[in-house]
């Protein structure tokens, strides 16, 4: 296991945790985790890299060891702004290799279109956007948001890290017991009563009242100048759950001018857990090209 370090930055008024697997002087890679995840989730991928990389991975606001947001809900544009400030702290004006999974992939793809000069190469792991929406959906969405703000979501407690690890294995049977235990101890924290809860702000569960506007997202994607590697898991059901068919999925990939597409066998949405060696091989081949 490659050892990581914890660093903290003041980012837009929040104490931000950034995990670093150091290799001073090597090319920088920045890894962006998904919804309800943490930076340590990339440990297996980092362990599988063969080349020397200086790797950084933030915990997004309200996740892991980063401070919770000061509002009662979270907004997608904040991730883009947080990333911009963080990259300035890590690399000043230099371009970096950006790798994002799921939510992190969506942030990375948007950012690479808004700040194309900051991204040398872009790897998107299962971050293909959200379901398209219609303006007529707005009243119901706002009503749901107001209801969830009043109800204030929470996380269920677990009796132990072992119980949380068991839940992770039920959700993803490909996880080995060792990997599930590792993830549980980074995803969870133990309270004074001994119960384990997820290490994050439950407000992340509150729906975004602003509809997903694919036309705006697509306009950003089309401005990406960096080469893009788009990797999905052969057994992933994520885009089907969003109601996207194969033609819509292909149309989204086609928005990137310089895209290479790869599919990882025997892997689902959490492909960096299921097949980290193959994902690392694809990434390093792409970055070296």
What are these regions (language model features)?
Residues 125-158:
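A catalytic-pocket lid/entrance helix-loop region that shapes and gates access to the active site
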Residues 1-29, 50-54, 92-94, 129, ...:
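Alpha/beta-hydrolase fold catalytic core
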Residues 264-276:
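Catalytic histidine-centered segment of alpha/beta-hydrolase-like enzymes
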Residues 223-267:
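Conserved loop-alpha-helix segment in the C-terminal half of the alpha/beta-hydrolase fold
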Residues 9-14, 56-99, 281:
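Active-site loop/oxyanion-hole signature of alpha/beta-hydrolase fold enzymes
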Residues 17-68:
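Conserved HGGG/HGGXW glycine-rich cap/lid loop of the alpha/beta-hydrolase fold
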Residues 94-137:
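Conserved hydrolase catalytic core segment
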